[in-house]
Amino acid sequence: MHQQKRQPELVEGNLPVFVFPTELIFYADDQSTHKQVLTLYNPYEFALKFKVLCTTPNKYVVVDAAGAVKPQCCMDIVIRHRDVRSCHYGVIDKFRLQVSEQSQRKALGRKEVVATLLPSAKEQQKEEEEKRIKEHLTESLFFEQSFQPENRTVSSGPSLLTVFLAVVCITALMLPTLGDVESLVPLYLHLSVNQKLVAAYILGLITMAIFRT
């Protein structure tokens, strides 16, 4: 009875939703990327219902588009791209994951994941490399023109420690879970579900901190 009285408070709030990854990239020339997996984490002490919505449902097949995640567990959601055509290159689609408590209908929280179809991974890498070079040249020119040793301003961007922690959390989420038999990764690098839940929670906090800077 005490838990039922707390449900309206949960409904009124904006419950953080932990999903990895937050971006899906499909490559037309690599069929292995046409099927990707979203992992929904539930670090809470109550079960969550989830529902996956999409801005262009005719382009994708979502396996288990609705279901439930037990407390302190995770759920893999398989997404397949079924309309790989050149006219869709570069178009940004969005998936929205809505979660609610099992006894409630109103969404407690939501998370958006963007999806993009690109022609080739090699072309994407080339474009990213060219972009990085241009950004590096622009930054170098800016510092050469405006650098003043006696009156430098402190950067408001994320610290190296924050970036390092984010990389560690992302790496932890990408490592296999305990019980994955087919993985080639050594067993001592397999993490438990609880460890991944902690990593997802910390990554969420870091992301919010970065957006506030």
UniProtKB/Swiss-Prot annotation:
Coiled-coil portions: none
Alphabetized InterPro entries for the sequence: Ig-like_fold, MOSPD1/3, MSP_dom, PapD-like_sf
Keyword line: Endoplasmic reticulum, Golgi apparatus, Membrane, Transmembrane, Transmembrane helix
Pfam families from the UniProt entry: Motile_Sperm
GO CC list: cytoplasm; endoplasmic reticulum membrane; Golgi membrane; nucleus; perinuclear region of cytoplasm
Any Gene Ontology biological process: negative regulation of transcription by RNA polymerase II
Keyword Iron: no
Record motif Nuclear export signal, residues: 205-208
Gene3D superfamilies registered for this protein in UniProt: Immunoglobulins
Principal subcellular localisation of the protein: endoplasmic reticulum
Places the protein is found: Endoplasmic reticulum membrane; Golgi apparatus membrane
Stretches assigned to the MSP domain: 16-143
Membrane topology: Multi-pass membrane protein
Transmembrane segment boundaries: 159-179, 191-211
Purpose: Plays a role in differentiation and/or proliferation of mesenchymal stem cells. Proposed to be involved in epithelial-to-mesenchymal transition (EMT). However, another study suggests that it is not required for EMT or stem cell self-renewal and acts during later stages of differentiation.
Protein name: Motile sperm domain-containing protein 1
Gene it is expressed from: MOSPD1
